[in-house]
């Protein structure tokens, strides 16, 4: 069978070139035709018409190539040994191999002749994307609204893709629900987002589910007004001075500023020193940015906060082609006492050192050359959701690593220390008086132009720009209130289809509209948000579609912390993890599954369990591990509560145990019954019923999620299985034996043959996700089976081996999920070649997750360089 996969891959990787059907007529009659006649016609045309497939209608390649959907189904059924059924006469290995090869050729030929083109469907943002887009547009320090799509709450800054490593400890909590949502840092008084339709066998960014009706347009207008008029919007908006602040008035002091380094920093740099005076108003576990230049692995930063169990001061820099970070512990109350403190970080090519009030608090030997070529600015006190709380002043940037003595002198208040080495500085000046060099209207018009560029993801055409600027002029003339007039303009932009619609066409005002379209697709795929300035600049220059530039941007974006949005959105939907919310083991029988009082359900353990597979996914993502580790891995993340649970010794905790802020520790695994996402308690519980595990549901989950092959729903008149404990004990049967009786029904046999082995492989896990060797009836669990009719296994470890033996099939299935998410639509038969090509390109690096993402982006189906 390995030869089949190899030959099929070679066929799929060859150029799409149509063959003359008449030249292949004899091939059909002498090759695949007789094989179909001998093994397939009885069930599909001659005597029966199973699956509504009548193969006798196709007597030539020309006939068959008119139905590429059928060809695809035939390839999948033959490849998985699903056809012919095992009880029927089977073709030889050579015959099966010939059929697969010829059908692959036919499929390629059909696609070459096909006129089918699947355009990117026009769709609106969903709730998750809208919140991210508004937050990024205004660089908000808070969320726009509380949202359950974001399951994991990060409490110790664990998600840091730029490091390429997940920490030993991740302090996290689950999404908050009910009244607890009111406590989350969010804009106050924002109206509810129009309800998104649920995703069934897909993702909630699918264009066929996300339309825009006149009623929705009215809702979005009300929503946009409530955003800019939220009572805490002004203080949370970090673009306030650049957009809303009256230019004739003193700038607001809610933000800080930035430093643009002198060019000599790149020419004559021997190191780096970041120095600042700080007065925190509060200390938090999350990082607080003092100064940061964001440029992928080339970033430079100085911050306070906690990560990996250490709270203190942190310095980071790009050294020798990689990002290096070092933190030194400092007692939080030493900096949070309401007084001014001097902090600094230095790197001299040999060592990174950290200082507080002139005293060295930590050092680490790091040898290498500092990267200095970045053109990005140093942001003061602000980076995404890591703002500085309190006051900053006298921030200095040096092109060399200063000595201990020089740091002591700065901490003592000296102003001219190493002045010749200083390449940038920033000081707060509360006495700055603005000097208007242009009329206020001209300043406002330029602000609006920049706003629309970011909001609409492309330059606004002259007519559109005039519409918004004239509206501002009218509002400002009537009210004389600059801020209110600008908010009216902004709320209109946020309600515009140009903002709300994701796959809208970029304005023809730019000759590079194709690049702007690509920037939008890319940012919504990886960040679930609008493009940043870096993407827009490249789009404006028409460079984004250049392969090397595009690859570089993908690397940058995958190392940006906004990529957490991808993990928060794709992973839970792929795993269908939200099904765990409604899973409810019987309260009386399984009381210890619930936290709370003796007579009420307060909190389910499932809400805690679901963090394990999501953290495992993030580990594979951040560390760019092979996706096979999502099936079987030698690590997992567990809290002490989850560890107790798996060992069957969990106590009944009251609800006051801290479940929204708890440590998950990276745990090595030697027992292969655990590891990966399939056998986590989360998946086992959500695929069970109130009283027992459900092998059919589990098998359906594996088929849908792991192999992207969801089974057809059962007929409406199928009788209940009646497999409760009392019935099974009375009949002396296991669930498996009972199900075998049920599967004798011809209407049920086909699906059960496919999903039953997948579900029974997991039967050693009870409905609570814990291991068992016997059922409660005392009968022994039988988890043996046969995967795709060729991989026999005795238990779940053997099942994992069987899945890994089909890693190419799993990789293609995963790629289908990923591509559907990336394109925001259901895949069709036209997309099969693209899936094969993306998977084939990722194979050489053993299907590493980030590599699959990168190959998806650079493939023509995503960047739309060509149309198939």
Give the ranges of each region predicted by the language model:
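Hydrophobic core residues within well-ordered beta-strands of beta-rich domains
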Residues: 272, 339-341, 391
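Low-complexity, glycine/serine/threonine/alanine-rich intrinsically disordered linker
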Residues: 19-51, 65-73, 77-82, 86-269, ...
